[in-house]
């Protein structure tokens, strides 16, 4: 069973010429993935990456073979904001699932935004100071361990210097900022927005509007929790940022989508989570099994789909999942003995 064909069948918007649901990520959608401490949802991030890279490979193969009957969806790339895991982890899991992030980067299919700090920068600065004290002009190459895992160029969202941006000249900015933390958050969100937009435009230009871009935020809680003491209300800044992203996705509904991972049990106040659900076109809630532990099934995916025309929400039939070392399997309810 395929996750996306299950969702596309219910929406009815993404069908091939034979009337079958396309096995690809829905276009023009803001998708919220909600998990908990007991049912962690990072496996879906890796599944999304696997799906879009395999769709790209399948599309390229079909083009080379002049095969017009491809039902695997349109290929594309991903722009991943890593706030939850290191690039090393994404890379290793990708190898197990059958794709190589370095290869995808070289093809122009993958961009990584490092939302975490740069822990190895102090080593380089200390080494430069030592070389200067010794009167050595040329810097010897650091070993790979000291440099950190960096198989290809990445974008650093945060470094050890103060973040500066020209956000005052953008319609996305607010000139009446009084709080330093609020200014910093706005600058970070502004930079994320720009990186997403630039990555999408670059991919569209290089592929003649035939390539999709998947924006991924893994996960949103770090931005929320880091600025939770902000008296001006950082949650509204994040929601405004998502609304800007959502509007851009709607304007380019055939070539981009966004996935957001959010840990719904990290905050006692559920208002922010409810607002996230209201903004999203589709919410995927990951939960454990009501019947308890099962060796064949890890948990359940519940879906809430938004109907923009009627401004209503509909529950889609849930499915079960099993996360293995080198694959992720999905099952219809009742198709496997628990």
Curated annotation (Swiss-Prot):
Q: Does the keyword Magnesium apply?
A: no
Which one GO biological process term can you cite for this protein? tRNA wobble uridine modification
Record text on subunit structure and interactions: Component of the elongator complex.
Q: Which gene encodes it?
A: elp6
Pathway(s) the chain acts in: tRNA modification; 5-methoxycarbonylmethyl-2-thiouridine-tRNA biosynthesis
CDD domains assigned to the protein according to its UniProt record, in alphabetical order: Elp6
What family does the entry list?
A: Belongs to the ELP6 family.
Q: Which residues form the signal peptide?
A: none
Q: What is this protein called?
A: Elongator complex protein 6
An annotated GO cellular component: elongator holoenzyme complex
Q: Which Pfam families match?
A: ELP6
Q: Where are the transmembrane segments?
A: none
Its taxonomic placement starts with: Eukaryota, Amoebozoa, Evosea, Eumycetozoa, Dictyostelia
Give the coiled coil ranges.
none
The entry's function note states: Component of the elongator complex which is required for multiple tRNA modifications, including mcm5U (5-methoxycarbonylmethyl uridine), mcm5s2U (5-methoxycarbonylmethyl-2-thiouridine), and ncm5U (5-carbamoylmethyl uridine). The elongator complex catalyzes formation of carboxymethyluridine in the wobble base at position 34 in tRNAs.
Q: Which UniProt keywords apply?
A: tRNA processing
């Amino acid at each position: 069973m395929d996750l996306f064909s299950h969702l596309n069948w219910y929406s009815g918007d993404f069908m091939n010429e034979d009337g079958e649901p396309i096995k690809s990520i829905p276009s023009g959608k803001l998708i919220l993935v909600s998990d908990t401490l007991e049912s962690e949802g990072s496996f879906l991030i890796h599944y999304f990456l696997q799906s879009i890279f395999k769709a790209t490979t399948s599309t390229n193969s079909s083009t080379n073979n002049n095969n017009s009957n491809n039902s695997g969806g349109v290929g594309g790339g991903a722009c991943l904001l890593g706030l939850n895991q290191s690039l090393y982890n994404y890379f290793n899991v990708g190898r197990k699932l059958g794709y190589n992030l370095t290869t995808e980067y070289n093809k122009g299919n993958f961009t990584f935004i490092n939302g975490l700090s740069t822990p190895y920068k102090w080593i380089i600065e200390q080494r430069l100071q030592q070389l200067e004290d010794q009167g050595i002009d040329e810097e010897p190459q650091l070993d790979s361990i000291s440099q950190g895992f960096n198989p290809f160029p990445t974008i650093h969202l945060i470094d050890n210097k103060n973040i500066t941006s020209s956000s005052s000249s953008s319609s996305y900015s607010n000139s009446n900022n009084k709080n330093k933390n609020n200014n910093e958050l706005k600058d970070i969100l502004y930079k994320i927005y720009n990186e997403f937009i630039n990555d999408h435009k670059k991919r569209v230009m290089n592929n003649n509007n035939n390539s999709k871009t998947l924006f991924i935020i893994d996960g949103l809680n770090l931005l929320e929790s880091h600025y939770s003491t902000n008296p001006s209300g950082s949650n509204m800044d994040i929601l405004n940022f998502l609304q800007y992203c959502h509007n851009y996705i709607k304007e380019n509904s055939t070539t981009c989508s966004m996935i957001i991972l959010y840990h719904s049990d990290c905050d006692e106040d559920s208002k922010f989570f409810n607002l996230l659900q209201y903004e999203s076109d589709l919410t995927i809630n990951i939960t454990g099994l009501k019947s308890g532990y099962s060796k064949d099934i890890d948990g359940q995916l519940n879906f809430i789909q938004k109907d923009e025309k009627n401004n209503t929400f509909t529950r889609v039939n849930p499915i079960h999942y099993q996360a293995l070392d080198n694959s992720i399997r999905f099952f219809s309810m009742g198709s496997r003995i628990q």
